[in-house]
Amino acid sequence: MATGDGTRAALTRRQIAAVVAGNGLEFYDFVTYSFFATQIGRALFPGDAAQSLLLSLATLGVGFVSRPLGGIVIGRMADRRGRKPAMILSFALMGIAIVGLALTPSYAAIGMAAPALAVLFRLLQGFSLGGEVGPNAAFLLEAAPPGRGGFYISLQFATADLAVLVAGLVGLALSSWLAPADLDAWGWRIAFLLGAMIVPFGLALRRTLVETLPAEEANAPAGGSVRPYLVIALAGMLMLGAATISNYTLSYLTTYAQTTLHMAVSTAFGATVVLGLVGVLGDLAGGWLADRYGCKRVLLGPWLLLLVLAVPAFLAMSAWRTPEALFGATAVLTLVHILGSTPAVLLFMQALPARIRAGGIGIVYALSIALFGGTTQLLETALIRWTGSPIAPAWYMTGAIAVGLAATLLIREPKRR
């Protein structure tokens, strides 16, 4: 990998795992909180069941608010002081936030201090996650051997999909083994603590990393103009927004199968398993193909297919309402989404110079998640109610992908090295 003094050193597999673990923990935390939102509401918030659940979900949402700030502060740190110290800071803050929430006393024990602490820890979690993505992605791109940048970046996304699977399995195991009262009292806390167990190991391994920010960039005077890259940032926002809407639409299929298609809970969770498995394979394939053929050439085909297939896939699910239709549509849509989204992110990253890469990625990613990730499922549920059409989410996803495709025209792909 390229180091700060221009030499090259190889990353070990454990070091790569330490870098991508942060992104995996992000998705593990999100899925775990979503899975146990009811139990968290009962434990930490006042009111009846409906009110406590609403407050619990609202607290999950506050984390989206602080993500852009984390992207700015920690991303700026990564571009000025180096990727390594920024990654150590963001991962440490993430561990504090997760353990803090897991150990927060109940509302019955400390009153309004419980929801206040929950909000504080979710804000800290969002801040750390906003600062985690940019430095990590920049590090992986800069550390990758020549011609392997796409594959290295794909590892970050594959880890996220793998974390979704692990979180689902942990949640199902705890809910199956524990009585409801135990799950409410302490069972949900175990799920968060299990995820936080990787933080000490990740921090220890991150301390062994070699800095990848070029020395001339780290020592350059602050305040260089970013104006020439505003168009690239806008294009990146639109592409990442399209990928985010598509991803959250596919994640919504578990809820969609239960509430709109009226399928069994076990069948609905099967869609999550399909999503995770296909996602991991698609991430790795998308990165490999981008290295071999170039980002634009790889992303155009899958995203054009997604434009064509989204509506028919939702029509098939709503018409047949069988596990085969649900799993088949999930697999096909996930594959074409992932094969296009991984190269799209890489295309944006490669267009940014090292001096603003971590901050640029972090801010654009955080804003995309805050604006689109936090609203997609709510909007799609509302669209189904307003239109009375079960395929409304497909049209929303199709429109987003069309905008993302148009945005690729604003970015010139650098020559592959």
Spans of features found by a protein language model:
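Extracytoplasmic gate region of multi-pass secondary transporters
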Residues: 34, 230-278, 373-377
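Extracellular/periplasmic helix-loop-helix junction of adjacent transmembrane segments
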Residues: 37-67
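Helix-to-loop junctions at the C-terminal end of transmembrane segments
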Residues: 71-82, 283-295
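Cytoplasmic membrane-interface "Motif A"-like loop-to-helix N-cap segments
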Residues: 80-91, 292-304
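C-terminal ends and interior cores of transmembrane alpha-helices
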Residues: 92-110, 305-320
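Glycine-rich segments within core transmembrane alpha-helices of 12-TM secondary carriers
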Residues: 151-172, 365-376
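C-terminal transmembrane helical hairpin of 12-TM major facilitator-type secondary transporters
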Residues: 297-343
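A late C-terminal transmembrane helix in Major Facilitator Superfamily
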Residues: 355-386
